[in-house]
């Protein structure tokens, strides 16, 4: 459940919203027009969560905050709580509605968008970069992260032909794998933060997933079959409708 509030007087113009359901809640607050600060809290059970949410809401109303039914949840950026990390309640509503499989909030599966070290780092740096530069072209981010920030080599997502991927793996296996993972993490990361994805980055992300599927086959990971996790991500990203 989401509730949103506004406080306005001669000196202040602030917003505060809360999303609480199950055993966790998230709040976002700050000056109207700003991204604001995000905080997430988890509880042992739903009863404790509801009790804390009611307490927080009552405290805000006592201070003079008024509920704002017209608050726009869509045209906003969403960032994870730095102390808690990856969480569905600090994800854009479009991400929450479309990417419902638990794999998208998985912090340990190497194939999931943010479960690998590479994916987690990509999301963290992407969020920090978008805070500083909200108009950042996310399609440029994978190469910028790997080459400019990390001083390593980025392999472009141009080809999904098996012979091309095989040749790139022979020349530089680590860079090929890392580039795939960073690219599709960035694609899902843009949606998680902004609720939409550029047409260019969506194509790059789909190519990265296809290339990673081929990489698993070429390097004989697992049982030699296509990864159902990667295929699920391909299907879900393909079907995601919000592009710009």
Curated annotation (Swiss-Prot):
CDD domains: WGR_MMR_like. Pfam families: WGR (PF05406). It comes from the Bacteria. Gene3D superfamilies: WGR domain. SMART domains: WGR (SM00773). Residues 1-78 form the WGR domain. This is Uncharacterized protein YfeS. The gene is yfeS.
């Amino acid at each position: 459940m989401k509730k949103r509030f506004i406080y306005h007087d001669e000196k202040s113009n602030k917003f505060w919203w809360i999303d609480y359901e199950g055993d966790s809640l998230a709040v976002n607050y700050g000056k109207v027009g700003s991204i604001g600060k995000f905080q997430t809290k988890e509880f042992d059970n739903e009863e404790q969560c509801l009790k804390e949410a009611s307490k927080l809401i009552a405290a805000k109303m006592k201070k003079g905050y008024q509920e704002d039914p017209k608050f726009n949840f869509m045209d906003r950026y969403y960032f994870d709580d730095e102390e808690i990390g990856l969480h569905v309640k600090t994800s854009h509503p479009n991400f929450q509605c479309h990417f419902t499989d638990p794999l998208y909030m998985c912090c340990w599966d190497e194939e999931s968008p943010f479960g690998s070290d590479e994916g987690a780092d990509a999301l963290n740096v992407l969020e920090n970069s978008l805070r500083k530069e909200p108009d950042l072209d996310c399609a440029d981010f994978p190469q910028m992260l790997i080459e400019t920030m990390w001083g390593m080599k980025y392999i472009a997502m141009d080809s999904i032909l098996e012979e091309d991927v095989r040749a790139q793996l022979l020349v530089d296996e680590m860079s090929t794998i890392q580039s795939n993972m960073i690219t599709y993490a960035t694609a899902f990361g843009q949606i998680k933060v902004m609720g939409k994805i550029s047409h260019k980055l969506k194509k790059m992300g789909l190519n990265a997933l296809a290339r990673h599927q081929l990489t698993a086959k070429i390097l004989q990971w697992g049982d030699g079959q296509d990864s159902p996790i990667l295929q699920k991500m391909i299907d879900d990203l393909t079907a995601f409708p919000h592009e710009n």
